[in-house]
Each structure stands twice: as C-alpha cells, then as structure tokens.
Amino acid sequence: MNRLLICALMTVALSAASSAVNAAKIERIVTPGGIEIWHVHDNMLPMISLEFGFVGGASQDPADKPGVANLVASLLDEGAGDLDARAFQERLEERAINISFSAQRDSLRGSLKTLVDHHDQAFDLLRLAVNAPRFDSSEVERVRAGVLAGLRRRTTNPGDIAGDRWFARAFPDHPYGRPVQGTLETVARIGIDDLRAFHRNTIARSNLKVATIGAIDAQEIAAFVDRVFAALPQEPQLVSVPEVVPQGGGEQEIVDLDVPQTVIAFGGIGLKRSDPDFIPAYVLNHILGGGSFSSRLYREVREKRGLAYSVYSYLAPYDRAGLFMGGVSTRNDRAAESLAIILDQIKKIAEAGPTAEELAKAKSYLIGSFPLRFDTSGKIAGQLLEIQLENLGIDYIDRRNGLIEAVTADDVRRAAARFLANARLLVTLVGRPDPVPNPAPATAGRG
C-alpha cells in the first residue's frame, strides 16, 4: 500500500457534505492537555485528516531575513527525532502517510492525512516533526538549494514579480511587504540558529488551532492530538505585528521585462474578515471580478474585447490589514486599454452599485456553490481550520448562507462606498506596456 491509495481515497466525494458538516455535527473537544479541536466523526472512508495552524507565520521572520518561516516549513518533515530525512520519508511512504507544512503571512500550517490502520504511526511521526525537527546541515543545504532555485525562477516570472513588487511598495517597513519565500540574498544568509529560533518562538499551544475529520471518535482524537502537541510550550514568543493600510495609492510602477505580455497587479484598502461589511463586500466583489465567467471585469475585458484570458479581483483579509486586489495579463500594446477598462468598471460599480439581477444571481451562485468547499474530507478539515483562524465561530457553516441571502442592495452600496468609491489604487505593471497607461485616477481605488 502506498500514497497512491491515500490520494485515491481522498478524492472520493463526500455526498451531502454541506448538510453533514454543520454545527450540530462539529464536535468542540478540549483535550486533557487543554488543546481545542473541532472534530467531525465520519466513517465513510477509513481515513483521518488533520489540519492545524500556528498563528504567526512569515510575519515573524527577522526583518533582515525574510524566508525563515518558509524554510522551516520546508524542513519540518526532513528528519526529526532519531530519524534522519531518508528514514523519516521512508516511514511515511511505507504507510501511505502524508505530512506537509506551509508558511503564510499570518500562520504556519500543517496537514496530516492517513489511513486509519496507520494512524498510530502517523501521529508519532507528526509529533516528531512538530516537536523535534533535526535541521541537519546537509538537509538544510539541500532544501535551501531547492528554495533558491525556485526564487531564481520567480525573478523571471512576470506574475511573481508583480505580486512581490506590489506588496513591497504597499507595505514598506512592515512584515507584509517582505516576500514569504524570502529573496536570493536573504535565504542564502539564513542559518540553522535562525530556524531553531523561529521554531522555538512560534510553535506553541496557545496560538494553535486544530481541525480533524475521519473514522475516529472524540476520545481517541483527543489523545492523539495531545500526543502531538501537548509537550509544546504554552505561550509563543511572537513579535508584535502592527495594524497597517497599504501605501502608494494612485501610484504606478512599471517593471521592465522583455516579455510579450504585461502582467498588471492592482490593489488598495479592502475590509478585514471581522468587519460587519465584509460579507456585502464579498458579494459585491463577486459581481465585479470574483465570479470568473459572470463578472463585469470578465465580460468587459475578455468577452467583449478579447483583451485577456483571465481578469479578476478579490478580497484579501489578512490579520493586520484588509486588501482589495486584482490582476490581468494582456498584450503589451493592450495593457493601457485593459487597465483603463478595469478602473472604469470599478468606478461604475462604486457609483451605481450592481443591478438587482446581478445581486440576485451572485447570491444564488455563492449559496449554491458553498457545498463544493466540503466535498472531500481534506477540504472539510481545511475549512474548519480557516474558520477558526478567522474567529468566525463554530456555527459559521450554519450561518454563512443566511448571511449571504440577507445582503441587500443598500448593504452592497454601503460596502462599495467604504473601499471603492473615491479611492485610489496602487498599480504594478511587469512587461513592456506601450503605450504606457495613465496613473490610476482618484476615483478608482484607495491606497
């Protein structure tokens, strides 16, 4: 039995997932060690999925060494305890166990997927990875080389360049302005002491969120979660990350790159997830640029004029900042036209709001598509973790569609007035746009 089996099982859809995963069936468990778990007991597959996150993430990187969190995440399963990297990976492979870690701006996250028959060994391996990563010098250098190779590729990828440059200009002197992956220079300077310090300061019990689903009861999962996490320090030693708003509103940066298309990234102030107007703003953005084939941006940029294959906007609610962002990739000689259309559509929806038909269709789609977020056990655990990290409450799944349905035209107009009307965007273009677009007007996005 190998990882192909676990992958096959994980892709089996869970029928009636959204109705099965509701607040009545999500158990809130507090382990003997004091760790809170949101658990769904499900016997449909002989599987257990666990998702967890530590609040902190890349925002905890030293200011002069971005990339530490990402390198730590890449190394946690590369040898732990008395198992070197090869032995650790062999144990995973032999038992079809999948363990992975990732770093984001506001959290360090991990995932475990295992067959029930191997859950004892799986949780033991996860315990070692979380508590006793080796950070052997040979593995650090091997993984570092892979990260550096990826960073070299990013230096020639227009989309990556646009995103990194946008964040750097929007958040100077703030952790959000530093790339999660680091840079070629900073990753080369990260030492093993930096990795150990990040692990020691960030991974603790009080900033831990855990979500599980599978063929295991509450008492068993509590014991296994304690086995993994109970020996961690109670409190992390986190660096305070200040609230921030994106800078550079109305500014435009062109990064010269010899490519046939220009990639445009734009953004400004949005709303944080805790904001009462976030749901109306979410519905509004779906109409503007979040609804793929149904959005105004898609219709005007792609469908009517054929300027781009993809154009989009989205809300990005970070812990310390709420953002409204978007992007498009188009021919160099059509970049100015594409950007002008995007800004014009933002202006129009900010001033007049959506039509009644647009609002009704958006709400219907957002409600009807919600079950797709829960059609595998991995997705369910991931959603439960996300809800915890965003402090939405254990009953959010039950409440969410009602919140969407309750959005009125007045709600949407109010949200638009807060983050789109009389606003200014920071725009980054990567390529060789000709003609050069005019800077974003004052009515198109706020920075």
Predicted features along the sequence, with ranges:
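Short acidic/His-enriched helical or mixed secondary-structure segments at domain edges of catalytic enzymes
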Residues: G146-R165, G248-T262, R299-A308, D319, ...
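M16/insulysin-pitrilysin zinc metalloprotease superfamily fold
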Residues: E78-D82, K113-R144, G291-S292, Y312-R373, ...
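Histidine-acidic residue clusters that define the catalytic metal-binding segment
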Residues: N22-I29, F88, G150, A168-L208, ...
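M16/MPP (pitrilysin/insulinase) zinc-metallopeptidase core fold and M16-derived inactive scaffolds
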Residues: I26, E51-V116, T156, P179, ...
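A structural supersecondary motif
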Residues: A58, A265-I269, G289-T330
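An aromatic/glycine/proline-enriched structural segment found at the starts
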Residues: P172, Y176, V180, A204-R205, ...
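C-terminal regions of mature proteins
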Residues: A168, K209-T212, V328, A360-G447
